[in-house]
Amino acid sequence: MFALSKSLRQIKRQTIQYRFISGISKDEVYCIIDTIKSSHEWHKLKQDQKMQAYVAEALTNPTSENVSELMQLKRKMMRTLNENYNLALGYIEEGLPGPIERLKFRSEFLRVVDSEHYAYFSKSLDHIRYCKGLDRATRRKEFYNCIELHRRCNPEVTEGSGILLPDDIHQWFFVFVPPDERMKHYLFLIENNVLISGHYAGLTQERMLKGSEMEYRVASFLHFIEDPEKRHIFDEKFSVMHPFRPMRRIVNLLITKKDMVHIKEYLDVLTTRLENVELRNERIPYDVRKLYFIEFMHTLQHFARCTNYIDMFLETVHSMMDALPKDTPVPFIRKSFVEILNYFQRIGDTETVFKIMSMFNEYPLTEPNTKFTNEMLGRILFSLRQFKDPKLTASYIVIAYKSIKTKKMLNNLGLWCLIFGNGFGRLNKKAIRDAKQPEKFINLNVPESLRFKRAPDSVALNELYIVVFDYYKSKLSPDEYRELVVKCYKYYCDFLKNHVNTYLQWRIDTSILRTMIHRAKFDIKDDRLAYEMLMNFYAMNLNPRFDSKNTPFGLVLYRNEAINQQEFNQVLELMQRCRAPMDHKIIITIVLKFIKSGNIDLAHEWYTRLLKTGYPLRHFKMIEEAKRLNWDIPEPAERYYEECERKNQLEEENFDDIYLQNPAEDSYTNDLIEAAKKIGRIYATSIGARIIPENDKAAMELNQKKNAYGT
């Protein structure tokens, strides 16, 4: 029995050793090479029928066995012929039957796999595409043979890096592969490690992902990862075939479809791909690498929105941050993290916000005193707002802004005693300088990278005021709460007037003023107090910056029945002097005010300006008045009005809380600046011509004639 088994193995080895291609063994072609080398009659290679038939058959039918024999012939020729190798190649190539075979031969018999090698491969494909006399089925078969030959001849390259097809070849496949053959075609691409790279490769992938369930599972590789016997195909080919964006397309679709069983493996592959290829390839322009990073973070945000796997989300973010090169500039990551923090803040997931922020303690990119650090601090304070705990927010500010000026500032504002003491007031300078941490102080672990060696800015202070007002609103009686808001306002004005260096007044903005006016208007319900706060503040001549699209002027004017027309005009005149931006809320307020006072011409002028800004009019009262006065109404506004009437919901736009924006995002937008420019003429015409100086008799006469304001 043992002897029989041994004999069978010997027969098998002999069968393999004496394998034939076109009836010719490799020993025969080796003998031809040796003979030609001795005689130097290289031209005979062109005419030798055995050599030509052997090579042509292997090129035309690139099975693994045929290609293995062909590559053995290549190595034999390189060893035997040395410097005459290229000469011999030329004669063999000339004898091959057609240009396709000649290009294939030249491509796969080059000594080195390099750009020239790929150029010949591309020429082979190009020739097949434009070769006349081939029907589609034959042309497709020739494409497949060429690709398969290339893979089998160069396994050390194609297994690790895949095969890049010119996009016009993918285009041919995309157009001419029959629908019932698409999955078979895609399986061929997978088998041969063809990269999903280029426009038409992407379209091919998209069509498969949106096709039948089986097509979707093949293109997404779920068909392989879920089958233990085929799992190796995912492990070996998924990361090779897919550059970052096609890979991300699959991950995004899995998330959308909630195919979450293997999502961690897909996210791991996507993360590894970005870390090791796109982010580290310096040949990719900086802006493109930055865009890849932003797209990756968008995928993670999509994952967080669609699932409850927050721990996996945080783990992936942490892994990506660890992998970033240490010299990565802050702007590279800023936009992505701002968007993610915005999302979690918007849904009220403060715990995740803090976990993301805690990563910066280990992250070397964010150096103190940078704009990024300041923004991150603002976001932390914004997240702390939900706890409505002044001690927590104030403690964080004192630790993050580690300067004696911080304590002095809070003391001058009356907040130190209010929060950590027994009531509103101030300590003397020595007491605040020598003060130890009060008992109510909360020790927090603030990363060193998120600390400043200076006093807090208006962003941080505004967050503290918001928390103070939210806390005491529920603790105090209405009269006591009103007294607190007024005291905070007076102490704040005193601080700006007496404790802010003249050279630093340019840093003053209106965010804190808006917060206090908002409390007067909507908490205390005192429009008159809101007006007085505004006018008294500007009487100090501090010229504050407008760092928000919502100025305090619109907040005071909107639905304010506590001021007369003259006071209304004074606010408009103040806006003119301050060159304050004007948004649609203010304009609507002005239009309705003029209608109420009977100044229809002026109301129509301002209404026209409102429409010219491009604002989508969705204010029921404004539309109703425009219809009553037979003014032109945009079609979308008409539809909105009719919809409201059908629902019997006479809606008005709610502006009450829109003035309190996230202070960390306090900035102009280009759209609002352009809108303000468009209506900038109001200062020179409507106000400049109609605001009546007290001692100007001519203007008084004009006022009487036109009854412009009706005071």
UniProtKB/Swiss-Prot annotation:
Q: Where in the cell is it found?
A: Mitochondrion inner membrane
| Transit peptide stretch | 1-28
Q: Provide the protein name.
A: Mitochondrial translation factor ATP22
Q: Gene symbol?
A: ATP22
A single cellular component GO annotation: mitochondrial inner membrane
How does the entry describe its membrane topology? Peripheral membrane protein
**Role, per record:** Translation factor specific for subunit 6 of the mitochondrial ATPase. Required for assembly of the CF(0) component of the ATPase.
Q: Where mainly found?
A: mitochondrion
Keyword annotations of the record: Membrane, Mitochondrion, Mitochondrion inner membrane, Transit peptide, Translation regulation
* InterPro entries assigned: Atp22
Q: Which family does it belong to?
A: Belongs to the ATP22 family.
State if Manganese is listed as a keyword: no
Asked whether the keyword Mitochondrion is assigned, the reply is yes
